[in-house]
Amino acid sequence: AKKRSRSRKRSASRKRSRSRKRSASKKSSKKHVRKALAAGMKNHLLAHPKGSNNFILAKKKAPRRRRRVAKKVKKAPPKARRRVRVAKSRRSRTARSRRRR
């Protein structure tokens, strides 16, 4: 029997499924983000709409709107695998630059 391709269109009810959301949020955890960075996947990490330091691992074919790469990730150190904290909240950085002025 021919294996069915994975690119099958997902039904609306499947898209709303909790397990899918849960697996997505799991992948946005810092541990996953660090692992992905270490694997050189920084272009697949998108800024998460909700959290300051959550990222979503996105597929290359994600719609352009969702494909915006998180700014904080771009500057991630090459030693991301060993670093514990990768993402600092954006707010603290802007506050720091304001203080400097």
Curated annotation (Swiss-Prot):
Q: In which tissues is it expressed?
A: Sperm.
**Does the keyword section mention Repeat?**
yes
Task: Return the Basic residues bias intervals.
Answer: 1-35, 58-101
GO molecular-function terms, A-Z: DNA binding
Q: Where are the sequence repeats?
A: 3-4, 5-6, 7-8, 9-10, 11-12, 13-14, 15-16, 17-18, 19-20, 21-22
Give the start-end ranges of region Globular. Answer: 32-65
Task: List the subcellular locations.
Answer: Nucleus; Chromosome
Region feature 10 X 2 AA approximate tandem repeats of [SK]-R, mapped onto this chain: 3-22
Q: Name one GO cellular component term.
A: chromosome
Which of UniProt's keywords are assigned here? Chromosome, DNA-binding, Nucleus, Repeat
Q: Where is this region: Disordered?
A: 1-101
Question: By what name is this protein known?
Answer: Histone H1-like protein EM6
Q: Which organism is it from?
A: Ensis minor (Razor shell)
